[in-house]
Amino acid sequence: MYFATFICTYAIFFVPLQSQTKSNNMRKTLILMLCAALVACSAKQQKMEDECLYSPSKTQFAFWSNAAEAMEVLIYDDAVTDQHLPLSLAKDSDNYWRATLHGDMIGKYYTVRSFQNGEWAPEAPGIFAKAVSVNGQRAAIIDLKATNPDGWDKDQRPAMPDRTDIVVYETHLRDFTMSPYSGVTNKGKFIGLTEEAPLNYLKELGITHLQLLPFFDYGSIDETTLDQNKYNWGYDPVNYNAPDGGYSTDPYDPACRIREAKQMIQALHKAGIRVIMDVVYNHTYDVMGCALGRVVPKYFYRLNADGTYANGSGCGNETASDHEMYRKFMVESVCYWAREYHIDGFRFDLMGIHDQETMRQIRAALDEIDPTILTYGEGWAAMAPAYPYEELAMKQWTYKMPRVGAFSDDIRNALIGSPFDHERGFASGNPAGAKDVMRGLIACPEWSGEPMQHVSYITCHDNYCLRDRIEVSAPEETEATKLRMNKLAQTAVLVSQGMTFIYGGEELYRTKQGIDNSYQSPDSINIIPWENREKYADLHDYYQAMIAIRRAHKGFRLGSAEAVKEHVEFVLTGNESLVIYRIKDLEGIDTAKSLMVILNGSAQTVTCDLPEMTGECVLLAADGQANPDGLDFAPYDKIDVAPYSATIIAEN
């Protein structure tokens, strides 16, 4: 580009304006070189995101395909009629097919189709459609600026001093709002999360980030029959870059879902809460039912040796992040959501299907927008991906992807047992996982380079919720004991040095009636039981207090592997049901000189000697109770730790 600019400058200012043939030919040659260079640079810099650029005077189209023999965009007056205007596209040297439609096209709809192997493929919205009709069948031409709510230009991400300060709360829009006890008027809608009741609840709980299950346009819910209240988690991508109409108040208006999604994010930001989007780039709802499969057949997917679609997702296909243009698509897509919607983080579903280089490029691109935007995901796949294992973004290679996190199924399995059997975990009486609990507490196992890459959790939308998990592994225990196990397991997460993650509703003792895969179960199974706020107030208040304790003490959030190594030690007693975790020498780091956490995973009271705690101490948690201001103040040289409970002491 700089060379082209030099040529331009030279041609205009330094080639003499003479009539001699030699000078004129030189000028023409230089100008032609400039034009060629500028065209090449323009093609290289073309964004897939800019497939439809609207202005009141014209709309420009640019679609990528390396296989089409011809392409055309079909212009419709509305979302339903068949009559359309076909517009032929011209191919450039970088496989972008372009056309310009003059005049004000706002309110029109479009699809694109490609001709190859002697036939026209089915039409589809563009690969990067940003606004779509009901059920995402056609893309809409809109003015994105007109979808911005009042004050959108002043919207700011809430401050986040350090990534280990994060407490993520995962929920689904319907889970959080559909209950008659939720206090929400616009149930199941983006704008339901702009209302006072849910915002106040989240603020009071003390979480920093709200992770929402997929809310891009997905295919498993018919948006024309929303009155039937059908439910789905949403891991069925159709149009990656438009919100789903099922969460809008008018799915027939392409701008409505965009505006209301922005209103939701704006309201959460005003409440001091960041928003994480659950993204599913690893597969599509089906292949020929979406633009990726129709516009450029097979290119965006990995194939088996026999030409069939690989299936690392377990959903019938897996995408090919290692292919240059799908990698480009993924990078541009997350950046689009970060810029246009002010999204604060991305949770990558089945991240292990993607290659490591793509995740590194996503991280680098987001850093250019805002380095505090989060990236983490599931470091595994459902089945074996069709790509070299050592190059995939699997959990064990997390350290190769700086500042990309992965869920720690290690600490989950150690604390509550594996989701693939009904065995107990440490928090429910099985000491076998004690060493993995310790590794999880320091958030520096062999696979994570830094604590922030270790997502400490015990439950999420997948598998059993915590109440049901404890029920299937310890059915003979009383409810009082099960509640103690619940608190103990979550305490270990909240004092871990990693990034903490809570599944929404666990603090209200939610149950899914024993269903461990509620992806399409009805609201009655999935909703958060707000009516439990009174019945299980003790559990809710414990979660709230533990979040406050974590946020009050930097010792639980040291932030680097080096600091963890310097300040953390374990006291070994020979009792495998006891984990004693001490964070020492905290002067200048924490208000406490040291912190002591004792986790008792047995059914017996255990007396612990505390020779290290020589100063006056504050008892922050004990026997299923917690208070960031202290339950008791006294010097402690020994303490009794109740069954299935955590004791936390701060030494002043």
PLM features per residue range, with description:
Residues 45-58, 92-170, 175-186:
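The feature marks proteins involved in alpha-glucan
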Residues 41-43:
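N-terminal Sec signal peptide cleavage junction
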Residues 107-110, 631-652:
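C-terminal beta-strand-rich structural cap/linker in extracellular carbohydrate-active enzymes
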Residues 172-196, 200-341, 351-354, 358-370, ...:
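Substrate-binding/active-site clefts of carbohydrate-active enzymes
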Residues 29-37:
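Sec-dependent N-terminal signal peptides
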Residues 57-62, 67-69, 569-611:
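Carbohydrate-binding surface patches
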Residues 63, 112, 171, 212, ...:
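Conserved, mostly hydrophobic/aromatic
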Residues 135, 139-142, 363-364, 368-509, ...:
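Conserved alpha/beta catalytic core and glycan-binding cleft of carbohydrate-active enzymes
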